[in-house]
Swiss-Prot record:
Modified residues annotated as Phosphoserine in this record: 247, 289
Pfam families in the record: TDA11
Gene responsible for this protein: TDA11
Basic residues bias locations: 473-482
Protein name: Topoisomerase I damage affected protein 11
Biased composition regions of type Basic and acidic residues, renumbered to the chain: 293-304, 406-424
Location(s) in or outside the cell: Cytoplasm
Family: Belongs to the TDA11 family.
UniProt lineage: Eukaryota, Fungi, Dikarya, Ascomycota, Saccharomycotina
Record keywords, A-Z: Coiled coil, Cytoplasm, Phosphoprotein
GO cellular component: cytoplasm
Native organism: Saccharomyces cerevisiae (strain YJM789) (Baker's yeast)
Amino acid sequence: MNKFDEFIESNEKDLDVDTSTRNSIISMSPVRKTGRKIRSASSNGYRLEHHRTSSAGSMHSQRLMTPTRLNDQDHPLQAKTDARRVVTRHSSVSVPNAMSKRRSLIQPMVVPTTPESQNNLPFGGSVSHSEGSYGIPLESTTVLSSEQAMASGLRRSRNGSSQSVNSMIATTIPTNGVDVSALLQSLATKELELLECKQKIEDLKKQTQHEEQNYTRRARELHELKEQVSKHLDPSLNTPVKNRAFSPVYQNIPLESRTENAGNSSLPSSVSKPKNMGHQSTNQSRSVSPQDIQERRQRDDSSDSSKQSLWSKPLALFNQFDKIIQHEIERTLNWDDSLSGTPEVQEGTPTSNSESSAQQYDNEAPGARQKSPSQGSVSRSLWSFVSDVKAGLLGIEEENDNDVITDNRCDPVYKSDRQHEQKKSTQKITNRGQAEDSGDDSSLNMRKFKTTTKFQKDNAGNNSLTDESGHRTREKKSKRSSNKLSFIGEPDNDNSSVKNSVEMTDF
């Protein structure tokens, strides 16, 4: 040995570092620093040799560990046992630096270990400290792969996480009647949550109210804009109400819409303006205004008046028909009375409309009372109607009165005999029809109209009257003082006719 080798060995002893070549693992102990003795395991078929190279390249015969056969372990990129070196606490070299030798381009991930795990690492199996040597069983020297290291790390992390979760559960779940502070804390949190929810509800309500106000305001603005547009498009809306009837556009508008617009314009408000159908459809969803109430009232009144007009038309027809009949009766009877040629002076006040009309007609000139053929046909049809009405009225009076009237031959005729009276009336009607068709006015079998005043005057004179043909009439005794119409007929085939009285008020 030269001085250089001695210097190296001395430094190795001082630093407790082995600078030998490949396949040498040094386990250093702070207690003993004696010579090295490595127990070989001949059963595995290895020769243990150790050699040291000097600067001169001389080989020193030292213990070497050389495999007896060549295998995959001799590959230069294979992880060797010297890659893992166990370093004590007193060593100056750290563990990552000791394992930082690179054997390939792909370096496995290194998991940091704790001091407790370092004692269990099966790098070289169990390190045996013998006197003066470090015993390492080579058959138990294996290297941990990266997968095993990762699995052990995950297992430890799982254990740690499970322990932390168990500790959290133990703190959150209170014991029965012991952890009151946790209960109070949970109660306070629940109350705070309820208060927050209530505050959110109030905020939402305020927001909805604000949105509703904005909606109503925008709807009002839209309505005003529509009114302005309608004014610009339809100039007839800007014209006064009096001049609208002359505009051609206003004449095409229905009557109902005119009344509605007139009602709206008469309201004492500056905002009241005529509305078209589109505006009314948009305003239906809004609240009812006083204008709408007045419009509805006007419509109801118009509907009531239309209903009343439906009933008034038939009544007007009946009244008109009644007036026509009354006028024709008075005119015909007055004309018959004027044929006698004895006009009489009007005396006193008339007791009814029939007396006044009859006296006025008697005072007229005889030339104005000429009968035309059309008047004859009208009088014939009218007399047939009057005779039917008279027959019905006489039948009722005959049942009530049961009076007996005598004629010139003093033959008693009872009013209860309705068939006899109807027979005579039909005969007289046919005779009058024949006379009128022939055009002989003097031979008409017409009955004369006599009032109570005339009847009293005749009774005061001769108590008898002569008609146009010179026949003598029947004597009469009036039992009633009321205003009645006396129909006096001509004698038919030397047979006296029956005199019947009908009140004018019955018509």
